[in-house]
A protein has these predicted regions:
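A conserved mid-protein helix/loop that constitutes part of the nucleotide-sugar donor-binding site
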Residues: 1-11
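Short alpha-helical segment that forms part of, or immediately flanks, the ligand-binding pocket
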Residues: 65, 88-93, 104-108
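Short hydrophobic beta-strand element within catalytic cores of glycosyltransferases
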Residues: 97-100
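A charged, aromatic-enriched C-terminal amphipathic alpha-helix characteristic of glycosyltransferases
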Residues: 125, 141-182
Length: 183
């Protein structure tokens, strides 16, 4: 997905739009980092060289969440069939306008709130779609209807996807499953 996002960023014409990239194999642990990070070196270097991109790399989740208020938008051109997406939920909870693909369960995760870009196996074409979506979205972020949309989105995610509620649901499910098995 990062290659798609960097491609899109190169197509964005608005000089006020910048991309901060928090991407690294380090998020998956030292062993994964050691085995896989070299595969992404060129991509990270490309991000460092682009004029409208700030390559930040790995930062702990707490850092990202505490700095989320500095951002307006979350662009996530997933090219994998995700079963859920915690970063999408956290950005939605933080009130960021979100753009993502409709691949896998991202539509179920984001409900009606994000702008969904139809997935395209042609990643160049997908980059073009994302560039257009980013530019169009940047032009409407100031509108009152968007502010209300983002407030509703944040309230929705905080009500239905908070960890206490999820933990309670799993506890009930597992208790029931264990109880049914022991009968």
């Amino acid at each position: 997905g990062l290659s798609v996002l960097l491609g899109a960023t190169q197509l964005v014409k608005n000089p006020l739009i910048t991309l901060d990239v928090y991407s690294s194999c380090e998020v998956y642990g030292k062993q994964f980092f050691d085995q896989n990070d070299h595969e992404y070196t060129e991509l990270y270097e490309q991000a460092r060289k682009l004029p409208n991109v700030n390559y930040i790399g790995y930062k702990p989740n707490s850092f990202i969440k505490s700095n989320m208020h500095k951002y307006n938008m979350y662009a996530y051109p997933s090219i994998f069939e995700e079963t859920s997406c915690i970063s999408l939920l956290e950005c939605m909870a933080g009130g960021l306008y979100s753009i993502t693909t409709n691949l896998g369960a991202l539509f179920e995760t984001g409900a009606e709130f994000p702008m969904y870009i139809p997935f395209d196996n042609d990643l160049r074409r997908l980059s073009m779609k994302f560039a257009a979506a980013i530019e169009a979205s940047a032009n409407i972020l100031h509108e009152e209807t968007i502010h209300k949309h983002l407030e509703t989105q944040s309230n929705y995610v905080n009500a239905y996807y908070n960890w206490n509620k999820i933990g309670t649901s799993w506890t009930r499910f597992l208790t029931g499953a264990i109880s049914a098995k022991t009968k």
